[in-house]
Amino acid sequence: MAKDVITGRKTSFGNKRSHALNASRRSWKPNLQKVRILVDGKPKRVWVSARALKSGKVTRV
């Protein structure tokens, strides 16, 4: 399972509820993008969430 290397966001799980409140399992996936960033001074291709990219927590190479 892919995981954001900056914020640690990954797929989360919970219940989908019908109108009658029956529960079935579902998952929420973060919007992960594979981008090149500097890791320890070297460019590396890693998974980063779109939220981290938009907020400026990471800059592309």
From Swiss-Prot:
GO cellular component: ribonucleoprotein complex; ribosome
Disordered: annotated segments: 1-26
Record's keyword terms, sorted: Ribonucleoprotein, Ribosomal protein
UniProt xrefs under InterPro entries: Bacterial_rp_bL28, Ribosomal_bL28, Ribosomal_bL28/bL31-like_sf, Ribosomal_bL28_bact-type, Ribosomal_bL28_sf
S-S bridge residues: none
Kinase found in the keyword field: no
Annotated GO biological process: translation
GO molecular function: structural constituent of ribosome
Source organism superkingdom: Bacteria
Protein family per UniProt: Belongs to the bacterial ribosomal protein bL28 family.
Name this protein carries in UniProt: Large ribosomal subunit protein bL28
Naturally occurring in which organism (per UniProt): Latilactobacillus sakei subsp. sakei (strain 23K) (Lactobacillus sakei subsp. sakei)
